[in-house]
């Protein structure tokens, strides 16, 4: 919702922003980690006029989503009430706060936790790996019941054996339920003596 408000008010926002407000907003967005230091310096360094800085700032905040835009709107409403009134942000802020359809987050405090791009990419990769591994386990357990040599070879050659399979498959191996046809594999995984060839 807040991102839609900023998109609608973009042109008026660019023409109305003052030097002090843009600098304060940049500091606020850095402090709340909407922008990182590099992004803030880029906005300041590469744009000579206040309008250019405002344009660059708004164009970097809007793609970051509703929570980032909400922080921007809240700062303007609290620090520059005249600008907020000019842009019609006071009413928009109230509408956003009253809207129960605002997206919630997964943080324990009930707020969205903003992070750096590198952290977001790392988390995304971890989730993708988890999904891939879970799908692989299911496929392998289904295919291995046929006892094919190809499956045994694939299982032994996988990079996951050293780190992942030792932890995930140890319990089923102890029970002898999933992979009974690979002699000694449970012991090798347990002691870490299995070597990839």
Swiss-Prot record:
This is Caspase recruitment domain-containing protein 16. Homooligomer. Interacts with CASP1, CASP4, CARD8 and RIPK2. SMART domains: CARD (SM00114). It comes from the Eukaryota. Gene3D superfamilies: Death Domain, Fas. Widely expressed. Expressed at higher level in placenta, spleen, lymph node and bone marrow. Weakly or not expressed in thymus. Induction: Down-regulated in patients suffering of Huntington disease. GO terms for cellular component: protease inhibitor complex; protein-containing complex. InterPro entries: CARD, DEATH-like_dom_sf, Pept_C14. Caspase inhibitor. Acts as a regulator of procaspase-1/CASP1 activation implicated in the regulation of the proteolytic maturation of pro-interleukin-1 beta (IL1B) and its release during inflammation. Inhibits the release of IL1B in response to LPS in monocytes. Also induces NF-kappa-B activation during the pro-inflammatory cytokine response. Also able to inhibit CASP1-mediated neuronal cell death, TNF-alpha, hypoxia-, UV-, and staurosporine-mediated cell death but not ER stress-mediated cell death. Keywords: Protease inhibitor, Thiol protease inhibitor. The lineage of its organism: Eukaryota, Metazoa, Chordata, Craniata, Vertebrata. Residues 1-91 form the CARD domain. Pfam families: CARD (PF00619). One of its GO terms (molecular function) is kinase binding.
């Amino acid at each position: 919702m807040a991102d839609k408000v900023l998109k609608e008010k973009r042109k008026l926002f660019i023409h109305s922003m003052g030097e002090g407000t843009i600098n304060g907003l940049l500091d606020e967005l850095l402090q709340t980690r909407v922008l990182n230091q590099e992004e803030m310096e880029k906005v300041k360094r590469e744009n000579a006029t206040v309008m250019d800085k405002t344009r660059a700032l708004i164009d970097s905040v809007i793609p970051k989503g509703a929570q980032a835009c909400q922080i921007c709107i809240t700062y303007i409403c609290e620090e520059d009430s005249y600008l907020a009134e000019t842009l019609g942000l006071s009413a928009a802020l109230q509408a956003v706060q009253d809207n129960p359809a605002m997206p919630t987050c997964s943080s324990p405090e009930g707020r969205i936790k903003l992070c750096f791009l590198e952290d977001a990419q790392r988390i995304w990769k971890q989730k993708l790996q988890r999904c891939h591994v879970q799908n692989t386990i299911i496929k392998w357990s289904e295919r291995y019941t046929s006892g094919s040599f190809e499956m045994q070879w694939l299982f032994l050659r996988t990079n996951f054996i050293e780190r992942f399979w030792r932890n995930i498959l140890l319990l089923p191996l102890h029970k002898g339920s999933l992979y009974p046809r690979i002699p000694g594999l449970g012991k090798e995984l347990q002691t870490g003596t299995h070597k990839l060839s």
